[in-house]
Regions:
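Classic N-terminal secretory signal peptides
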Residues: 11-14
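Subset-of-secretome marker
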Residues: 24-158
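Bacterial N-terminal signal peptides that target proteins for export
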Residues: 1-9
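C-terminal motif of bacterial Sec signal peptides marking the signal peptidase cleavage site
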Residues: 18-20
Length: 158
């Protein structure tokens, strides 16, 4: 019994040290418009100022302006079709009676910023990515990315 207790204490201590030393952080930014809300969630390394993942969640409230429901759904579906097959990008879309939603997750380590074929296939998506993920000194800088999106009226969620 004492051996199990000692082993458990050692494992908890090791876990505490590993988690305590991690410099990974998460930040959220929101852009609220009349009928839409865009949330950007960055996962980044504080010490290295490098982004590892970006999640974009776009929600269109169709109860606020039903005239544009089909146009929004069509535009979302076009963007999804463009994104299919781009390495490092996953997405989910959801429709219900009140909302049209698109969630895009970008794995910065796998995503190819300079892939000309993908860039030509999905110009709207790449323009959004280049706004939200700013490269500096061969990394995607969290601070530079944050400053860029704040210029587009995103607000940091504290």
């Amino acid at each position: 019994m004492k051996k199990i207790l000692k082993l458990t204490m050692v494992l908890f201590g090791a876990l505490f040290v590993l988690l305590g030393c991690s410099s990974e952080a998460k930040s959220e930014f929101v852009l609220q418009k009349t009928a839409s809300k865009t949330k950007l969630t960055y996962v980044y390394d504080k010490e290295k100022d490098s982004v590892s993942k970006l999640t974009m969640n776009i929600v269109y409230d169709i109860t606020k302006d039903e005239r544009y429901t089909e146009a929004v759904r069509s535009q979302r579906n076009e963007i999804v079709a463009e994104m299919e097959g781009i390495e490092g990008v996953t997405f989910t879309k959801k429709d219900d009676n009140n909302y049209i939603t698109l969630t895009v997750e970008i794995d910065v380590q796998k995503f190819k910023f300079d892939d000309l074929v993908s860039r030509q296939k999905a110009p709207t998506f790449y323009n959004s990515v280049n706004t939200a993920l700013v490269r500096k000194n061969n990394i995607v800088s969290y601070e530079e990315s944050k400053n860029a999106i704040l210029q587009y009226e995103f607000k940091e969620v504290k």
